[in-house]
Amino acid sequence: MIKARQALSKGMATNELLLAVALSLMIIILGVGLGWEGNKVTPVNPATSAHYNLEPNNRLSFMSNWDGPNYLDIAQNGYANKDEANFFPLYPLTVRFVHTFVKSLLDSGLIVAWLSLVGAVYFYLKIVKQIYHIKDNLEAMRGVLFFILFPTAVFLMATYTEGLFAFLALGAIYYALRKKYIAAGLFAMLSTATHVDGMFVVLLIGMLMLENRVRPLKIAASVAIGTLGLAAFMTWQKIKFNNPLEFITAQKGHSWLNLSDAHFLRLIVSLNGIFVLLLLVSALYWWPRRKSFSIFSLMYASTFFFVGKDLGGLGRYSLVAFPLQLMFYDYFRNKKAIYPLIIALSAILWTFFTLHYAGGYTGG
């Protein structure tokens, strides 16, 4: 048994994929465990619309709340009406494919999310090692902890598009950092078919290429490849709804793009407003260090202009704003007394948001 543990520890220290699997499995077990017992801590939201109700006997149904059931509905029935046109297609398409082999639609959605989480953690490890020239996986893991224990990281393992988007976006960013621009463009292309924020990733790839003084034509080619996912979705929406921008129109029905006079005040007093503040701090932090990371943070901070009255989604979207998490690692990694305290605080906030989500609330 001791030798087996030593072999596993050595394997994780030398193999990024094995470490990614171990970290993902750990966070999934913790998240599901919290949700399983969450009803004893967080009162369940009585609104039936907040929950996935098609598999009442599935004990994991608490992992599919709010937008989660919409993605599963699209996976099963397609885009039956315009109300769901704002949900990007690649995640439900992937769930639909898995559902041909797995009986439960909910389980299919979770399988896609959990496998995507492994991929996202894998690429995050690679990004940390690439940026900081680290060879030790266990040191890189100290940076990844800020990602998997980010307060709203519950969405990486729920039936949301976030897990798949994080995998594809971080893959695109990693390959751009490695100057493998065709691979970066292909990953970015899939990311723009997965999430509305995919274009942020495309723009970041362009900025990283500019920083590396890549020829303009090569930059244009990579950016063009990256936009193909969104272009395909817009083309399909033109055919289906006679409006290539139906995904924007549909957002208004979900309280997006409806700004009111009290919007800024709500931002200040909202928990989600904290994420905007952190993104602005990240932009300031990275400006003298790496301007592309600073601008990427500002892109995500700008989303508060478009979110709805409850400011929902800001924390969730911040998941892929990786310079924000890297800022914490960059600043605290050599502060041995403070680093574990920051990780502990992040874990407490992660627990709060996870219980909140499992109870049928937005959770960020």
What does each of the following model-derived ranges do?
Residues 26-43, 63, 190, 202-299, ...:
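Membrane-lumen/periplasm interface segments of specific transmembrane helices
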Residues 62-103:
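Short hydrophobic/aromatic helix or loop-helix immediately within or flanking a transmembrane segment
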Residues 223-227, 334-362:
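Signature aromatic-anchored transmembrane alpha helix within multi-pass, membrane-resident enzymes
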Residues 137-138, 172-183, 210-213, 332:
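Membrane-interface transmembrane helices that cradle and orient dolichyl/undecaprenyl
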Residues 115-116, 130, 137, 142-176, ...:
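Multi-pass, polyprenyl lipid-linked donor-dependent membrane glycosyltransferases
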Residues 96-97, 108-133, 281-284:
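Transmembrane-helix motifs of polytopic, lipid-linked glycan transferases
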Residues 107-108, 124-149, 183, 291-295:
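Transmembrane-helix signature of polytopic, membrane-embedded enzymes
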Residues 1-51, 215-222, 340-341:
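Start-transfer (signal-anchor) and selected internal transmembrane alpha helices
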